[in-house]
Amino acid sequence: MNIAKIVVGGIVAGIICFVGDGVVHGVLLQPIWLDIAGTLNLPPGDPAASFAYYALYDLAKGFASVALYAAIRPRFGPGPRTAVIAGLAIWALCIPIPLLGLLPTHFFGRKFALLWSIYGAFPVVIGAVAGAALYKEEARSPA
C-alpha cells in the first residue's frame, strides 16, 4: 500500500464528502432538520464548532474510502468499479446501518432516514472514486 497516496486521495475524498454533505444536509434535508430542531426546541448550533466536527468526520470517511480501495484493489483490480465498491462499503457503515439502529428511537422517521441514506451515498461514492483515481501502488524495485 502507498500510504502517501492514501493520504492525498483521502484528503480529496474527504473534501468532496464535506462539500457534498453540506448540500445534502444544508439544502436537500434542511427543511426536515429545521422541523426536527423546532419540535425538540433545540437551540441553533455553533457554526464554527459544527464546521470543524463535520470536516474531521468527512475527512475520516474520505480516508476510510481510499484506504479500503487500496486494501481491496489487489482482489478487485484498479479502477472506478473497485472505488465504487469501497465507497458503498464506507457509505453503508456510516449512514444507512447507523440510521437503521436509530429508527426505534423515533427521533426521525423512516422516510427521512431513507432520503438521508440515498442522498448521502453520492458524496461518499464520488469522493471514493476521485480519491482512488489519485491512488497508485508504489513501484516495486527489481529483486
Where are these regions (language model features)?
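Juxtamembrane/disordered regions of integral membrane proteins
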Residues: 1-143
